[in-house]
Amino acid sequence: MFTFYMYLAPIVAGVLIGLNWLLAKSNPNIDKAGPFECGFTSYQQSRAAFSVAFILVAILFLPFDLEISSILPYVTSAYNNGLYGLIILIIFLMMLVIAFILEIQLRVLKIERSYDKDRSDSNYYDHEI
């Protein structure tokens, strides 16, 4: 069965590359055809703006995600670890909860809204052009 998949994987990859080559739109451009060098003239806007709140959520998500994934080995060996492993797990989870409560108290997770609360809909639509 392993030999079958060893032959099948390159065949599927070749078919997909061939389909892409046949069905892809061709949009030749002198900038695309040449080698990439610093300072070339861009033919479209290359940097799109995104919210700072997105970066904040991503930065806060990363440590908690890594810490939660470090709990997974305990799940597979909970029987062998016994009471000592359970106590270590509870201490670890308490540190996570305390860190999360601290972030909430410091208002790190408060994301500002993009609309103005003082502006009502009637004032928004009643101005003259």
From Swiss-Prot:
User: Which taxonomic lineage is given here?
Assistant: Eukaryota, Fungi, Dikarya, Ascomycota, Saccharomycotina
**GO CC annotation, single:** mitochondrial membrane
The domain of life for this entry's organism is Eukaryota
Specify the enzyme's EC class, one word.
Answer: translocase
Q: Where are the transmembrane segments?
A: 4-24, 48-68, 82-102
Q: What is its main location?
A: mitochondrion
Stored InterPro entries: NADH_UbQ/plastoQ_OxRdtase_su3 (IPR000440), NDAH_ubi_oxred_su3_sf (IPR038430)
GO-annotated molecular function:
NADH dehydrogenase (ubiquinone) activity
- Membrane recorded as keyword: yes
> Carries keyword Mitochondrion?
yes
> What protein name does the entry list?
NADH-ubiquinone oxidoreductase chain 3
